[in-house]
């Protein structure tokens, strides 16, 4: 049986007691089934030459490494998060391309390949995750690795007009073709990648999703990531902490609109605040009878764009509360702090509306978690952006354009007044999809397809080691 090697920018520590979600749950499920290695950055800066830190529990080994301060700045802060993240979320105006950062990004991917190489066994299959590691298969191929290597992109893939604006777009595209299997959240993302590829070179497609570009064979497929619906339902249904129980009792006659995500410009938070203001303005009958709570803990707080959005939200929340607030009623609660994930599941369950309106999102698991946390006999309503990957699956949500505040306001009004029978029907339809496409099915489908790939021959690999594009000067 093939061993599984998972490679990601960060690894979840084996002693992590906090409720893991998303990538960690799926990866651990796959590793437990096959046995293997999880390899990635420790999250710490220090001496890169130190030996790997290894921990083994059962049939899984965790191997982590430190990054130097310079590599952390170039690879992680300046290229991954100041170039790729904004570009892949359609925000070219926020891209800050610097050649030293690009060189650092490539340098760290090469360093990771050097560190992983001695750990790879002949029949291992390798599963690489996300935008931090786009060149990683290429670096392994240069070192003679012919194993099956798959890649899953958790964030959107932009259209050619966006992607080709990146100075190293040609190199990145060719490097991606060194993976055997490329997985995307949605069909739109998969097609955007192929469109970008076709704009740079000839692409031969066989059987729909098998391709050849630059003489390299690879496959593309869609794997929408899921959640653990049963676990979330269990967390949501447990007893309420005393403070939350008291708050629920105090607000028994108030309908609650709830949102939670990390503070990020891709999430559409300023637009969401303005849509809530439009609800209060266009549907004044709700004033004094609803409350919107937005939880948005700070992330990447050292980046100017994130500081700017935090200040903007603080200003907008104060302005809206000052304009519409009444004695005894505050219309908007904005909390810039972290909450325990299990507590959030309970808050989801007692919210009448889940408001999830990113401007662009690969999937958005919060939308799925909100549905899974509901009481099937009295569920809340999900208002969901058409630009979230989850909108392709959760078609029974109220789908909105987050750029149209009046559209979002109308959907909120509809959600707040929706009859119980319709709420139950919509929730049941969405929950059925979530259960069928849970996190375990996601990883099982990907691993199955990767195992079916024919390994690359050393002869073909030797041909592929010659890069078509020169490196950026």
Swiss-Prot record:
<keyword id="KW-0328">Glycosyltransferase</keyword>
<feature type="site" description="Involved in alpha anomer selectivity">
    <location>
        <position position="155"/>
    </location>
</feature>
<comment type="subunit">
    <text>Homotetramer.</text>
</comment>
<dbReference type="Pfam" id="PF00982">
    <property type="entry name" value="Glyco_transf_20"/>
</dbReference>
<feature type="binding site">
    <location>
        <begin position="21"/>
        <end position="22"/>
    </location>
    <ligand>
        <name>UDP-alpha-D-glucose</name>
    </ligand>
</feature>
<feature type="binding site">
    <location>
        <position position="300"/>
    </location>
    <ligand>
        <name>D-glucose 6-phosphate</name>
    </ligand>
</feature>
<keyword id="KW-0808">Transferase</keyword>
<feature type="binding site">
    <location>
        <position position="76"/>
    </location>
    <ligand>
        <name>D-glucose 6-phosphate</name>
    </ligand>
</feature>
<dbReference type="InterPro" id="IPR001830">
    <property type="entry name" value="Glyco_trans_20"/>
</dbReference>
<comment type="pathway">
    <text>Glycan biosynthesis; trehalose biosynthesis.</text>
</comment>
<feature type="region of interest" description="Disordered">
    <location>
        <begin position="454"/>
        <end position="473"/>
    </location>
</feature>
<feature type="binding site">
    <location>
        <position position="10"/>
    </location>
    <ligand>
        <name>D-glucose 6-phosphate</name>
    </ligand>
</feature>
<dbReference type="GO" id="GO:0005992">
    <property type="term" value="P:trehalose biosynthetic process"/>
</dbReference>
<dbReference type="GO" id="GO:0003825">
    <property type="term" value="F:alpha,alpha-trehalose-phosphate synthase (UDP-forming) activity"/>
</dbReference>
<feature type="binding site">
    <location>
        <position position="130"/>
    </location>
    <ligand>
        <name>D-glucose 6-phosphate</name>
    </ligand>
</feature>
<feature type="binding site">
    <location>
        <position position="262"/>
    </location>
    <ligand>
        <name>UDP-alpha-D-glucose</name>
    </ligand>
</feature>
<comment type="similarity">
    <text>Belongs to the glycosyltransferase 20 family.</text>
</comment>
<feature type="site" description="Involved in alpha anomer selectivity">
    <location>
        <position position="85"/>
    </location>
</feature>
<feature type="binding site">
    <location>
        <position position="339"/>
    </location>
    <ligand>
        <name>UDP-alpha-D-glucose</name>
    </ligand>
</feature>
<feature type="binding site">
    <location>
        <begin position="365"/>
        <end position="369"/>
    </location>
    <ligand>
        <name>UDP-alpha-D-glucose</name>
    </ligand>
</feature>
<dbReference type="InterPro" id="IPR012766">
    <property type="entry name" value="Trehalose_OtsA"/>
</dbReference>
<comment type="function">
    <text>Probably involved in the osmoprotection via the biosynthesis of trehalose. Catalyzes the transfer of glucose from UDP-alpha-D-glucose (UDP-Glc) to D-glucose 6-phosphate (Glc-6-P) to form trehalose-6-phosphate. Acts with retention of the anomeric configuration of the UDP-sugar donor.</text>
</comment>
<protein>
    <recommendedName>
        <fullName>Trehalose-6-phosphate synthase</fullName>
        <ecNumber>2.4.1.15</ecNumber>
    </recommendedName>
</protein>
<feature type="binding site">
    <location>
        <position position="267"/>
    </location>
    <ligand>
        <name>UDP-alpha-D-glucose</name>
    </ligand>
</feature>
């Amino acid at each position: 049986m093939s061993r599984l090697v998972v490679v990601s920018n960060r690894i979840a520590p084996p002693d992590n007691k906090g409720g893991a979600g998303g990538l960690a749950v799926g990866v651990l499920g796959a590793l437990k089934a096959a046995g293997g290695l999880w390899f990635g950055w420790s999250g710490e800066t220090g001496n890169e030459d130190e030996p790997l830190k290894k921990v083994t529990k059962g049939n899984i080994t965790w191997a982590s490494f430190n990054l130097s301060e310079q590599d952390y700045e170039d690879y992680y802060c300046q290229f991954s998060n100041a170039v790729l993240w904004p570009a892949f979320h359609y925000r070219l105006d926020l891209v800050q391309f610097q050649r030293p950062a690009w060189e650092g990004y490539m340098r760290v991917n090469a360093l990771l390949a050097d560190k992983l190489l001695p750990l790879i066994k002949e029949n291992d299959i390798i599963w690489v995750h996300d935008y931090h590691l786009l060149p990683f298969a290429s670096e392994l191929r240069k070192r003679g690795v012919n194993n099956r290597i798959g890649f899953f992109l958790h964030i959107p893939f932009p259209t050619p007009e966006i992607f080709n604006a990146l100075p190293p777009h040609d190199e990145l595209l060719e490097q991606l073709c060194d993976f055997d299997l490329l997985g995307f959240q949605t069909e739109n993302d998969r097609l955007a990648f192929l469109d970008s590829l076709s704009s740079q070179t000839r692409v031969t497609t066989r059987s729909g999703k098998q391709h050849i570009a630059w003489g390299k064979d690879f496959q593309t497929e869609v794997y929408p990531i899921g959640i653990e619906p049963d676990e979330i339902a269990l967390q949501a249904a447990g007893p309420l902490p005393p403070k939350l129980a008291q708050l629920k009792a105090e607000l028994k006659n108030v309908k609650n609109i709830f949102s939670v995500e990390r503070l990020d410009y891709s999430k559409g938070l300023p637009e969401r605040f303005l849509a809530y203001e439009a609800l209060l303005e266009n549907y004044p009958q709700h004033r004094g009878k609803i409350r919107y709570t937005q939880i948005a803990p700070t992330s990447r707080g050292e980046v100017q764009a994130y500081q700017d959005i935090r200040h903007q939200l603080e200003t907008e929340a104060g302005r809206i509360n000052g304009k519409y607030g009444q004695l005894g009623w505050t219309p908007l609660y904005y909390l810039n702090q972290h909450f325990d994930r299990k507590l959030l599941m309970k808050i989801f369950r007692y919210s009448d509306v889940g408001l999830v309106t990113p401007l662009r999102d690969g999937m958005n698991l919060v939308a799925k978690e909100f549905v899974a946390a509901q009481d099937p006999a009295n569920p809340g309503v999900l208002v969901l952006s058409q630009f979230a990957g989850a909108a392709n699956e959760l078609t029974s949500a109220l789908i909105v354009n987050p750029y149209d505040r009046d559209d979002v306001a109308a959907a909120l009004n509809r959600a707040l007044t929706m009859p119980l029978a319709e709420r139950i029907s919509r929730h049941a339809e969405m929950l059925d999809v979530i259960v069928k496409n849970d996190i375990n099915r996601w990883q099982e489908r990907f691993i199955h397809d990767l195992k079916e790939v024919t390994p690359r021959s050393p002869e073909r690999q030797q041909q592929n080691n010659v890069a078509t594009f020169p490196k950026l000067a």
